Amino acid sequence: MALAQQLRSESDFEQLPDDVAVSANIADIEEKRGFTSHFVFVIEVKTKGGSKYLIYRRYRQFYALQSKLEERFGPESKNSPFTCSLPTLPAKVYMGAKQEIAETRIPALNAYMKNLLSLPVCVLMDPDVRIFFYQSAYDAEQVPQALRRLRPRTRKIKGVSPQGAIMDRMEAPRAEALFDFTGNSKLELSFKAGDVIFLLSKINKDWLEGTSQGATGIFPGSFVKILKDFPEDEDTTNWLRCYFYEDTGKTIKDIAVEEDLSSTPLFKDLLALMRREFQREDIALSYQDAEGDLVRLLSDEDVGLMVKQARGLPSQKRLFPWKLHVTQKDNYSVYNTVP
């Protein structure tokens, strides 16, 4: 939608900070195995200042944002002097294959974000809108997979300096071309079968960036054979530490969770995850309070209190600051019941 057609005026738009999101488009969906197995939408966001980045959002985050906006700006809002016609969010779906549901939602969610970011400046500057489109530390460290709906992002590369050329290239990441490839723009690297390409970066799952014969550009990874790969990236998996109580004693288990360390899970999701991991249905979840006593979790409010109390506590890298204690449901001996 052209700026002249948008509800906000051009002068208001020019006064926006450069880091405000002005467009967003879903690049792909990815399955995540966090507290639950779910699909997230990989969204490319463009800001007024021209920067681009990726964020990862679930449908329920769209739904939570829409609920807040309706309360604040909807026709029946009593909390704001300004109201407007908000875009329509695709409805919740309670049955069906998760991947198929996510795929079918993409066009409607793209339209939703386009219309949302075309609303007046006061909506764009709303704190919840800004947080939704903000790239968190968790977003920034994620490695995108295919990005099927976008061409790979590119960057201009300076020429290799003479000092760089002195380095032992046999130690550098490199690949051998299996087939001829002719780039369709100056950003793409053309080469012949048999050429050796020195690798500069991995754009995404399907595209690489490299240099050969004095030229630099991107190319599809399927056209080459890797001779020396990039060094292993640092593991970005987050872990949840659990203490499992049995008649024979207590064991410790760290569970891989693809969630932000600052996220707060739902009680039912935590319980389902623990039942799946320990293959037991008759379990109870607890956490340890500041006095060292176990407190049983029974609701989302209890989980929120656990997460809140753990903030600021020292913790290991990539380990959730709060810990779960998993006991048998009818075992109350682990609790300090003495007044």
Curated annotation (Swiss-Prot):
PROSITE patterns: PB1, PX, SH3. Disulfide bonds: none annotated. Residues 237-329 form the PB1 domain. The keyword Cell cycle does not apply. SUPFAM superfamilies: CAD & PB1 domains, PX domain, SH3-domain. Its main location: cytoplasm. The modification Phosphothreonine is found at T154. GO terms for molecular function: phosphatidylinositol-3-phosphate binding; superoxide-generating NADPH oxidase activator activity. Keywords: Cytoplasm, Endosome, Lipid-binding, Membrane, Phosphoprotein, SH3 domain. Residues 170-229 form the SH3 domain. It holds the Pfam family PX. One of its GO terms (biological process) is phagocytosis. It is found in: Cytoplasm, Cytosol; Endosome membrane; Membrane. Residues 19-140 form the PX domain. A 1,2-diacyl-sn-glycero-3-phospho-(1D-myo-inositol-3-phosphate) binds at R58, Y59, R60, K92, V93, Y94. The modification Phosphoserine is found at S315. Component of the phagocyte NADPH oxidase complex composed of an obligatory core heterodimer formed by the membrane proteins CYBA and CYBB and the cytosolic regulatory subunits NCF1/p47-phox, NCF2/p67-phox, NCF4/p40-phox and the small GTPase RAC1 or RAC2. Part of a cytosolic complex composed at least by NCF1, NCF2 and NCF4. Interacts with NCF2. Interacts with NCF1. The NCF2-NCF4 complex interacts with GBP7 (via GB1/RHD3-type G domain). Subunit of the phagocyte NADPH oxidase complex that mediates the transfer of electrons from cytosolic NADPH to O2 to produce the superoxide anion (O2(-)). In the activated complex, electrons are first transferred from NADPH to flavin adenine dinucleotide (FAD) and subsequently transferred via two heme molecules to molecular oxygen, producing superoxide through an outer-sphere reaction. This is Neutrophil cytosol factor 4. It comes from Mus musculus.
